Amino acid sequence: MGANAQKETLKFAPQWFPQAQFAGYYVALDQGFYEEAGLDVKILHPTDDESSMKLLRTGKADVMSSFLMDALSARLSMDIPLINIAQLSQHSSLMFVTKAKSDIDTITELDGKQVAIWSAGFDRLPKALMKEKNNEVEFVPIYNTINLFLEGGVDAMTVMYYNEYDQIINSGVNKEELNTFFFSDYDGFDIPEDGLYCLEHTYRERREDLKKFVRATLKGWNYVEQNKEYALNLVVERMDKAHIANNRAHQRWMLNRMLDLLTPGDKDVKRGHLLESDFQRALNVIQSEARSGAEMQKIKFNDFYKPFAD
């Protein structure tokens, strides 16, 4: 595209503060992939007062990233007309951890225990898994710390493999001192996470811009795979600018785990795409957790998922 050509502004809201989880977007912006596609992309991270969902709903953002479960739930129970335009993560990174000395060696032994869980969402899948296992647990809400678990205030903690698990290890706990229960190991609970979403009217009105954004983003992630230290430099720069404490080793761990999640592995799906079976799996969990008699919207796969990846 010529240097003087008009570029279309597109505002993107990741679902969390700056970290390696979003390295592909930073790289696509810094390398000029968005600009080459004719886009002027603005990355708007959420704040304590405005979530990425709020930024999207109020028109301050055109596209957001979100977990599949969260987006599908918002569409079904809150009637927010979200469209999945790309599925980046292909697996779940959620897990429970316990201390080996707790003698909680199997997931059924969580019955009657206290489990720390984030107060800012992410609770639907852990609760559904406990229900599936007929476990009665007390979920203890926390914000953004591993201290309660480290100090023995709870028996277990819900963590992301790419994030809090490594924080626990970095705090001085050896891997051998932990028992781990990966949701991806349990039938029906390996539900993909990060995807890209827009509202229905944005999809109707800006399809070409959305396609360009998705493909430039995937190009950014492909570049990250071959240039990890450069990508980490951008991540740390973003975190420093946002005055967020950071640890390069931890961000490197997160980056590598995110790249793992973007890789389909033995799944019959191309990068950037969503399997209908994964959609159905997420839908099954949401419907099983719906309160008795609750009215929920019905949705078909092809109405929710309209991909722009190659």
What residues fall within each predicted segment?
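Short, surface-exposed acidic
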Residues: 136-139, 175-180, 241-257, 291-300
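Short beta-strand->loop
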Residues: 81-89, 138-140, 175-191
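Short, glycine-/small- and polar/acidic-enriched structural segments
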Residues: 6-142, 146-159
